[in-house]
Amino acid sequence: KIVNVGVMMKGKGFMDKNMNVGMKDFRPEQMKVERILHEEFPDLEIRLEFPVNNLKIDGHPCAGAVLDIAILGYKVAIRMMGEIHQWSKKSRVKDQYQLYALEEAGWQVIDFIKDEFPAVWNRSKKEVKLNEAKEEVLDRLRKEKVAFL
């Protein structure tokens, strides 16, 4: 079951042009990973842009997080880490802080870093590229020993 929750905001006052037909604005790499997961594991409850609140680090409240992809039931958080996460020191600090908070809340956090998953970020619709992306995703999940494998 796939339930899309939330809209990625692109600035103050942003209104998704697709809202009137119930579509959301998600990044292509995010939708590709979600589609692979749904095709391979149709029984998973997958959410995009899933908010997680009431997080703590060492017992102290901290900011909530919006997960790029959440696999509910197994509490697997997938973060799509594009270029800004690599070159921005602030983003790296925020990401590490968020990682600690999510892990403390019982989430298994898996990062898909752009440079390590070129087929996932590749915009080609060719079957060979889509199969490469599928292998990248499944290899990473096996490496992380996710519970649903």
What are these regions (language model features)?
Residues I2-L149:
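Nucleic-acid endo/exonuclease domains
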